[in-house]
Design a protein with these regions (language model features):
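C-terminal ends of transmembrane helices
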Residues: 23-33, 56, 81-94, 139-151, ...
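Cytoplasmic-side transmembrane-helix entry/capping segments in multi-pass membrane proteins
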Residues: 38-46, 68-74, 94-105, 129, ...
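Structural signature of hydrophobic alpha-helical transmembrane segments
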Residues: 7-19, 64-78, 122-135
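Helix-coil boundary and interhelical linker segments in multi-pass alpha-helical membrane proteins
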Residues: 1-10, 57-67, 111-126, 171-183
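Small-residue-rich segments of transmembrane alpha-helices in multi-pass membrane proteins
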Residues: 44-52, 101-114, 132, 157-171, ...
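Short, structured motif recognition centered on aromatic/hydrophobic residues
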Residues: 42-46, 53-59, 128, 132, ...
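The first (N-terminal) embedded transmembrane alpha-helix
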Residues: 12-25, 43-46, 165-166
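Intrinsically disordered, low-complexity non-transmembrane regions of multi-pass membrane transporters
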Residues: 1-7, 203-224
Length: 224
């Protein structure tokens, strides 16, 4: 299905862009955690390729694309080298990194959903794998770096929700036979914009409601 929407060269270019920006985020975290050069390279690879590897193993697309296309493997290493030598400059362009990361999130959730459907999965499972393609690398990155995955932390701006929206849009388009290059692009843009808005306005998922803490806060506000 994805092959019907974009030429192979366009698909490959979009994959490389997404892999590169995700690798940058992994390499930056490695620098902040004082990893050595090998650790920076490993974290860049894990972040960039983890979600896609998980998807391909689940749907039976073996060997995974990351092992059959040298460009997929080399791109994270290039990103790691860039961060290793120029990380102060890269840190100063964090806004640009966030923008590209949001774009990668949109691209990967759409590509992951369509590829899973192409391999015979149902719409719900395809959307779930689209989500995992988009966020799986980040989860593995945080685990390797010995951190609680930012995906499940309340003090992090929404990340999974934009990907869920994008993957759901693709699944609905498939269901109603409306998946085109335009609607796929719309899903990417929607995911991209939602992620940037979450960063701009610090949108976060709600936590479990605690009656006792709510009552204490209300009492404190009433106390003169």
């Amino acid at each position: 299905m994805l092959q019907d929407l974009f030429t192979p060269s366009v698909q490959h270019a979009l994959d490389i862009v997404g892999i590169f920006v995700f690798a940058i985020s992994g390499a930056l975290l490695a620098v902040r955690k004082n990893f050595d050069v090998f650790g920076i390279a490993v974290l860049a690879e894990v972040t960039a390729l983890g979600g896609g590897l998980f998807r391909d193993l689940v749907i039976g697309a073996v060997p995974p694309a990351a092992f059959t296309d040298l460009g997929y493997f080399i791109t994270p290493l290039f990103a790691a080298a860039l961060v290793f030598f120029l990380h102060p400059e890269v840190e100063r362009t964090q806004l640009a990194v966030n923008v590209f990361d949001a774009a990668g999130l949109g691209l990967f959730c759409v590509a992951g959903t369509t590829k899973a459907y192409d391999y015979g999965l149902g719409l719900t499972a395809s959307a779930a794998l689209g989500l995992m393609t988009a966020v799986g690398g980040g989860v593995l990155r945080d685990i390797v770096a010995n951190e609680v995955p930012s995906l499940v932390r309340w003090d992090r701006d929404l990340y999974a929700v934009p990907a869920i929206v994008g993957a759901t849009m693709v699944a609905l388009c498939i269901r109603y036979e409306a998946l085109t290059a335009f609607t796929s692009g719309l899903a990417v843009v929607t995911t991209f914009v939602l992620r940037l808005l979450a960063l701009r306005y610090h949108w976060r998922a709600p936590r479990a409601w605690n009656r006792r803490s709510t009552a204490v806060e209300a009492e404190a506000q009433e106390t003169p």
